[in-house]
Amino acid sequence: MKYMNFKNVMIFILSLITVWIVVVFFCYKGYFINIEVGQIQLGDCRDFTTQDSVVFDTGADFSYISSNKIGFPFLSPVLVNDGEGNNKILPMYFTQYFEVNDKVKIKNFTYISGFKNNKFKAIIGMNVLSKLNMLFHSTQNILDIKSFDFKPQIPSSATILQYKDRISPKVTLRLDNEVIDDILIDTGFDGDLSIDEHYIEKLKSNHSCDSMISTNNTLFDTQKVKKIIFSELYINERLYKNIHVVQLKKRLLGSKFLKRFDKVFWDSKNLTVYMWNENDEY
């Protein structure tokens, strides 16, 4: 009898653990996410940060909120890596409701907390952004959050980037004559490009100056990095001027490059990013 009671207790505990794992999995994958569309006025930052310091960050596969008071209790611990070799185990939570600029409401998504960053109060990462489409208007500095099925009229001359991983939007770029794979499109990075020293030295284009800058792109801390300004650089066989390249281990295509265009359409449904100017031919 005691054995049967113990066995039943263990079965019950294992059932609870299984249910909890399934719930955490579904929450983490974003199956419950619901988004009310709207327009958001971005701030003065060079990246995709709103006026109330919320970053729409395609370079992050997770979301972050500085306070865990808005969510349900702790779901599980997760290992977070900032891409520069820094790791932290942080708590993951689930929230039913988060509002950005009193315009866009995001419901039922997971986020991490447990550390402070004075640069922003929240990150909306690809666990959420992969469920919606975005249209950026550079002249008005407005980010238009659209439904998953929305698609604007796009000119035939638009610059097109396609990626394969819904959560990690990496592309291949030709910089002058160098083909570089696995460059992450990162709207949380405020430069044009980030590549390592090996590729910087191989580029043939002239660069005008080197300087050292501080960057917050390590997520947990700041670091000093080298910034090189290329007076001219071919990117996918198009010539661009005054390209700001930061020397990092991470390969990034940043928001400064995206904002060189009048409009940017992020098509999450078809894993494609379109960039064009108002005078481009339709």
Task: Map each language-model feature to its residues.
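Pepsin/retropepsin-fold aspartyl endopeptidases
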Residues: 2-282
